[in-house]
Swiss-Prot record:
Quaternary structure, from the entry: Monomer. Interacts with MHC class II molecules alpha/HLA-DRB1 and beta/HLA-DRA chains. The interaction with MHC-II molecules occurs at both zinc-dependent and zinc-independent sites. Interacts with T-cell receptor beta variable 7-9/TRBV7-9.
Superkingdom in the source lineage: Bacteria
Keywords associated with the record: Disulfide bond, Enterotoxin, Metal-binding, Secreted, Signal, Superantigen, Toxin, Zinc
Protein name: Enterotoxin type A
Species of provenance: Staphylococcus aureus
Length: 257
């Protein structure tokens, strides 16, 4: 009897350390799998830069920043953002509208995003890095405890387990970018997402979907990037899309053909 009880408790403990199946489905309603872009349609430069962005490059992460400075009306310039970077001092954040800027300019904000220097236009030349979105309000946006986001992942229709620690946030309202950066890093590490076929990059198409209980879902074609360099590859985050982290989960669909 004691052995049976111990076995049951061990099973429960192991289950809680991985992402459960949460309101998932084997196919996304947002984008048909046949419409997903194939990895072979990306140029080699773009594929290499996607790998660099999501796996190797450090991210801009900070809390409780404030700035009234701008370069253009759809930007906010954070002077002295980098304190120990080899090249950059300032961070120029670009949004797709002035309305978004007005929500954050002069307010206490938190930042989490992928930044780049090559082809960054604005600020002090060679001393300013650029980033699209990645901004949330600081005040009254902190969870009482860190949120670990459950992930459902299917590879060619077969569900694979994803550790529950893979994607997490301490924010009530979080940018999709923050969650997406963490998820794609895992996909690169586990599945060589942005490797070429020669270097064991077996995944040929993919879709990531961010679901919440109260808002429309947000989805990205994992190989749907435009252009070759960070200034265009990262433009999907320019809308600074945020979602409520409560009762949310992520669905990922990967295909090897």
């Amino acid at each position: 009897m004691k052995k049976t009880a111990f076995t049951l408790l061990l099973f429960i403990a192991l289950t809680l350390t991985t992402s459960p199946l949460v309101n998932g489905s084997e196919k996304s309603e947002e984008i048909n799998e046949k419409d997903l872009r194939k990895k072979s349609e990306l140029q080699g430069t773009a594929l290499g830069n996607l790998k660099q962005i999501y796996y190797y490059n450090e991210k801009a992460k900070t809390e409780n920043k404030e700035s009234h400075d701008q370069f253009l009306q759809h930007t906010i310039l954070f002077k002295g953002f980098f304190t120990d970077h080899s090249w950059y001092n300032d961070l120029l954040v670009d949004f797709d509208s002035k309305d978004i800027v007005d929500k954050y300019k002069g307010k206490k904000v938190d930042l989490y995003g992928a930044y780049y220097g090559y082809q960054c236009a604005g600020g002090t030349p060679n001393k300013t890095a650029c980033m699209y979105g990645g901004v949330t309000l600081h005040d009254n946006n902190r969870l009482t405890e860190e949120k670990k986001v459950p992930i459902n992942l299917w590879l060619d229709g077969k569900q694979n387990t994803v550790p529950l620690e893979t994607v997490k946030t301490n924010k009530k309202n979080v940018t999709v970018q923050e969650l997406d950066l963490q998820a794609r890093r895992y996909l690169q590490e586990k599945y060589n997402l942005y490797n070429s076929d020669v270097f064991d990059g077996k995944v040929q198409r993919g879709l990531i979907v961010f679901h919440t209980s109260t808002e429309p879902s947000v989805n990205y074609d994992l190989f749907g990037a435009q252009g070759q360099y960070s200034n265009t590859l990262l433009r999907i985050y320019r809308d600074n899309k945020t979602i409520n982290s409560e009762n949310m989960h992520i669905d990922i669909y990967l295909y090897t053909s």
